[in-house]
Amino acid sequence: LPAEDEFAEYEQLQASIGSTKKALRILDANANIEDLEIAANRRKDDLLVYFALGLFDRRAKYSEMPNSLQRDIKVFFRTYQSALAEGRESLFSIASPEVIAVACQSASAILPSSVHDESDQLTFHQKYLELLPPVLRIYVGCASQLFGDLEEVDLIKIHIRSGKVSFMGYDDFETSPLPTLTQRIKVKLRDQDV
């Protein structure tokens, strides 16, 4: 449920209905709240990616985190330790080609545009990165730890079996009917090499 500082109409809602819990019960009884459930699932996925990739940095103390993040941890993971454990488990799961293959199959079904060779690779536009299942976002996130900023990248290719990610940049990708490849960087996750 959203907290007081998470939406502008909180006081108006409180005056007319009473509480966010009561408002949610009314919505649940009278409307389809599927969009709320989808948003909650997306937020949990975002947090999972955050905690998995956060293992590469110094771990922040729970007490130093913003209140909104503390609330989300309580809602989606119950405890900070559980959030860290799920993040760690998700990070380690990217070592399995089977996990990556299943996630690529799932991603190819939901991405607006992609090329998927089931035995070998999934290629997609960088702007669709946030639409990927969490395990693939973590996979690409690990590669970007070695590669750097993805700002100049147009296409990303996930190599399913070999533990590699390719980042490709093109001249005039968005406007040219046949853009020229200007950069292709292949990150070998298993060797931690670019």
Predicted regions and their residues:
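Basic, alpha-helical nucleic-acid-binding regions used in initiation and control of genome expression
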Residues: 1-194
